Amino acid sequence: MAVVTMRQLLESGVHFGHQTRRWNPKMKRFIFTERNGIYIIDLRQTLDYIEKAYDFVRGTVAEGGSILFVGTKKQAQEAIAEQATRVGQPYVNHRWLGGMLTNFQTVYKRLQRMKELEALGDLSGTAAGYTKKETLQLSREKEKLSRTLGGLRDMQKLPAAIWVVDTKKEHIAVDEARKLGIPVIAVLDTNCDPDEVDYPIPGNDDAIRSAELLTKVVAAAVADGLIARSGRRRGTDEKPEAGVASDEPLAEWERELLEEPKKSDEPKSDEQPAAAAAE
């Protein structure tokens, strides 16, 4: 059974790219066609790349590695925190602090400080041995650390790979991972650079449902890897579905994505970015 179905991708809007005037020419090979000034991503390729990313994540986790989930844009924050927590992986869903990977020793010290403050208990009143002013300062420090580093509290070492929603927004995280040789798995919208990613998944990185579905797929791969790591057998080679598809009818042009591509629908090699109406 497939990790995720074509219908699920369509219903989550994974196929919608950016306006044709906002694109990266390197993404041409992932584009199926253009509709009303919007690029449509080839979901056949998306399915293939999802399989590759799934197998990589599963294998990495099965061998003892961890996956750092990264997505600080509003559309991805909830899914990143929810899915990473569900499978016990670290995550960053607020501002990425420079050096979170390349200067992890310092980050680790801050994590220990956060745990020390948490051990003090409730800081809403006056903590034992501290003045009211000191207690207020400690409370603010604890809140700040929890907001920025809370998702990393159990991370003891660098992750084996990172999962990213929106490589343009999270370019610092991607750059740090590349410097350290940490594989990057990411959603690639039509304005992204595929050369920056080791395991790309062509898709919409702006829609909430798209970010949620793809993050759920990565989390499912992590869960599968944890099962393999523990030595338990699933009893089947089938991969878990990321969700349940409905039976709502698809639009005619969406059905084209389920059929063989027509040559006329493929992006032309000399195609130039066309002007489109503002979003």
From Swiss-Prot:
The keyword Manganese does not apply. PROSITE patterns: RIBOSOMAL_S2_1. One of its GO terms (molecular function) is structural constituent of ribosome. Residues 232-279 are annotated as: Disordered. One of its GO terms (biological process) is translation. Keywords: Ribonucleoprotein, Ribosomal protein. Residues 252-271 have a biased composition (Basic and acidic residues). It comes from the Bacteria. Pfam families: Ribosomal_S2. The keyword Nucleotide-binding does not apply. NCBIfam families: rpsB_bact (TIGR01011). This is Small ribosomal subunit protein uS2.
